């Protein structure tokens, strides 16, 4: 019984310590999505630009080391040539390291994100093509995609600037990848 009480106290202390030490980030991002289609000898790339908003929480790993794990959700809408539109929900999970440089903290991070594509379409000469429906025997694009993420946050007081690169780990469609670059500004609370 003493062991159970001791484990309960340790669990409560860990939970309370984690909750009090968490950092919540809110951000608005400029997003560039590069869709690269490899057909034939030359790849074709379509750059799509837009915005995303997101919220995430960073919690310290056990111990006094400056490592954190971060998880959150972003909603992204990007627009490209041929009246292309892509709307996605992104769930990032990453490991961060905190570097204190006086008044500025650098938080380099690496991890994975799961992307759920909500809407993907192109309009050409009055015809709208849905990326996620197979037409004329072509295979449809995948609604779910796994991406890596690499980046860094620079934090000053309660504000931060973030640069992140999200290379595709799974294809958007046959011989088609989607890579993202985000430049974000936000605040912590």
PLM feature spans:
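Basic side chains
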Residues: 2-5, 27, 59, 153
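Outer-membrane beta-barrel transmembrane domain signature
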Residues: 33-34, 46, 51, 59-67, ...
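Cleavable N-terminal export/targeting peptides
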Residues: 1-25
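Short stretches within intrinsically disordered, low-complexity N-terminal or propeptide regions
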Residues: 10-14, 35, 156
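Short glycine/proline- and aromatic-enriched beta-strand/turn motifs that initiate or cap beta-hairpins
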Residues: 20-59
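Amphipathic, positively biased hydrophobic alpha-helical segments used for protein targeting
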Residues: 11, 19, 40, 122, ...
